[in-house]
């Protein structure tokens, strides 16, 4: 019985090593374009982003300012301070211009007949991820990492794929400075059709 357990463990380790060898992970760090504001056609592959700012991830659009007390002016009652009436307060988020929408765009290539997943370590917030003009996933939470399988949206003709990410921070959505933008890494994960999924514990095929 002991030898059977050892054999099973060895087989599982061998399978895991084999699957790991068939998985590649690339940081999508450079060659991003960014623009503040809500731009209707920015998700489309043919959109011209040449006039946008060139950025490297991680990127926080608000930390460059301008700093202004009106950026985080809030009319609120702080119940923890036993306040019953709302009053104007400022400085709670550092006066940074984090409120609003922003777009990020880049492109990536993938081999044919593979499963492709995008893993976002941090995107603040209300992230809508588009691949080749189609929405691949939505993730509202800015502090949690998330991933989405983008295989169904990839070009099948060998052309580069366009990745666009729309983010939005709404007014009075935070009591402290939350960050703004793709403030953590973005990973491109390529696997075979049979693979262990991201954060998975079992094989899928």
Which residue stretches match the model-derived regions?
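Serine/threonine-rich low-complexity intrinsically disordered regions
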Residues: 1-4, 68, 85, 111, ...
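Generic low-complexity, intrinsically disordered sequence content enriched
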Residues: 11, 15-17, 32, 61, ...
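Accessory carbohydrate-binding/adhesion or oligomerization-edge regions at the termini
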Residues: 21-85, 162-168, 182, 187-188
């Amino acid at each position: 019985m002991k030898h059977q357990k050892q054999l099973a463990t060895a087989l599982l380790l061998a399978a895991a090593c084999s699957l790991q060898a068939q998985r590649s992970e690339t940081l999508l760090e450079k060659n991003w374009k960014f623009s503040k504001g809500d731009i209707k056609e920015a998700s489309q592959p043919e959109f011209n982003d040449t006039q946008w700012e060139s950025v490297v991830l991680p990127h926080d659009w608000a930390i460059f300012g301008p700093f202004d007390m009106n950026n985080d002016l809030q009319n609120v009652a702080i119940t923890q301070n036993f306040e019953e009436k709302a009053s104007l307060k400022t400085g709670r988020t550092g006066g940074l211009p984090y409120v609003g929408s922003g777009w990020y765009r880049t492109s990536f290539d993938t081999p044919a007949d593979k499963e492709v997943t995008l893993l976002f370590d941090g995107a603040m917030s209300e992230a809508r991820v588009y691949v080749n003009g189609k929405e691949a996933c939505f993730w509202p939470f800015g502090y949690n990492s998330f991933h989405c399988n983008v295989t169904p949206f990839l070009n099948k003709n060998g052309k580069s794929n366009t990745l666009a990410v729309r983010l939005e921070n709404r007014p009075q959505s935070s009591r402290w400075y939350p960050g703004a933008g793709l403030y953590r890494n973005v990973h491109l994960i390529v696997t075979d059709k049979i693979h262990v999924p991201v954060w998975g514990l079992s094989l899928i095929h």
